[in-house]
Design a protein with these regions (language model features):
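Conserved phosphate/ATP/ADP-binding segment of small-molecule kinases
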Residues: 148, 152-157, 162-238
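Conserved phosphate-binding/catalytic loop of the ribokinase/pfkB sugar-kinase fold
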Residues: 84, 94-132, 137
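Short glycine/proline- and charge-enriched loop/turn segments
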Residues: 20-28, 184, 239-243
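Conserved phosphate-binding/catalytic region of the ribokinase-like
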Residues: 3, 198-310
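Glycine-rich phosphate/adenosyl-contacting loop at the front of the ribokinase-like
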Residues: 1-70, 74, 92
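A glycine-rich helix N-cap at a beta->alpha junction
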Residues: 71-86
């Protein structure tokens, strides 16, 4: 059944300045609207590596919601478990500076409580034959509990990302039950109540290794933008993954692509450093385009001997 991805759908509204960006001032520019959401992007990224994920989510009961389903289905994502409900999609509004980085953002989260009922009713058929599970840690607590319960029942690996760290902090205890957790440097600082922005990769790696050991977190990967990423396991394994050197067009979705690549690697037999390397390549492919998902790849390009199913 492939990798099961569980999370919210957002509509991303992105503003780009046409000339030098003036904080607090009026800026002429262009505005784009695209389908987004961490796990929606992750599902499409996995599908773009010619794997066939299943996306469990909610969309609005409108034409916009149907558009999301249609686009994912076109990319060969299994959309059987996407339900249409009122207020099923969130909105993410972001303004970018001249370097392609987000300088201001506001998000309105959707109501994801119906996911708990969906997993209660159909959890067995969703998870029994899947290859692995990827989800957003900032879903409702009952939803997270349901995912972890099913993962334990069917002995499936579970991987988590986040879109809102303040909400995810309330789920911190669940990290001990997750096979690998991926976040960025700023989010890691919030998670461990510390300041990491000044740290170089080597220092960040040592700090992360100490933190995952003391917090009993099985495995964690922290992305550091242009400086790459660091990883650490509670058993002492740790390392640095350098970033790929590319021209930055738009950083939206790069973290999601990194997470997708890491999940793909860990699910299909790669070591943690090899999985992070796949994540780094997918992230680079997103950064150098205006899209928020990666272009098409084949599994063999990442050393994955998985048949492509059409």
């Amino acid at each position: 059944m492939g990798i099961v991805v569980i999370g919210a759908v957002f509509v991303d509204i992105k503003g780009y300045p046409l000339s030098t960006y003036i904080p607090g001032g009026r800026n002429a520019g262009r505005v784009e609207q695209v389908h987004g959401g961490v796990c929606r992007n992750v599902a499409e990224d996995i599908a773009n590596v010619e794997l066939r994920p299943t996306f469990v989510s909610l969309v609005d009961d409108t034409g916009s919601g149907q558009d999301v389903i249609d686009k994912l289905a076109k990319h060969k994502v299994n959309t059987k478990y996407i339900e249409k409900v009122p207020d099923g999609m969130g909105t993410w509004l972001a303004v970018f500076d001249n370097n392609g980085d987000v300088c201001a953002a506001i998000s309105k989260r959707p109501d994801t409580t119906p996911l708990t009922r969906l997993l209660e009713e159909k959890g067995d058929e969703i998870f029994a034959d899947c290859d692995g599970i990827a989800f957003e840690l900032d879903l409702e607590k009952d939803t997270v509990k349901q995912i972890l319960r099913c993962a334990k029942k069917y002995n499936k690996k579970v991987y988590a990302a986040i879109s809102n760290m303040s909400i995810a902090m309330e789920r911190r205890a669940f990290l001990q039950e997750i096979d690998c957790f991926v976040c960025n440097q700023q989010e890691a600082g919030l998670l461990f109540s510390d300041e990491y922005d000044h740290m170089a990769p080597e220092e960040m790696c040592r700090t992360l290794a100490a933190n995952v050991h003391s917090a009993n977190i099985p495995c964690m990967v922290v992305t550091m933008g242009g400086e790459g990423a660091v990883y650490a396991r509670s058993n002492g394994e740790s390392g640095v993954v350098p970033a790929k050197k590319v021209d930055v067009i738009d950083t939206t979705g790069a973290g999601d692509a990194f997470f997708a690549g890491t999940v793909i690697g860990l699910t299909y037999g790669k070591t943690l450093p090899e999985a992070c390397e796949i994540g780094s390549r997918l992230a680079a492919s997103v950064i150098c385009t205006a899209e928020n998902v990666c272009p098409r790849f084949r599994p063999l390009e990442f050393g994955l001997n998985i048949p492509v199913v059409d």
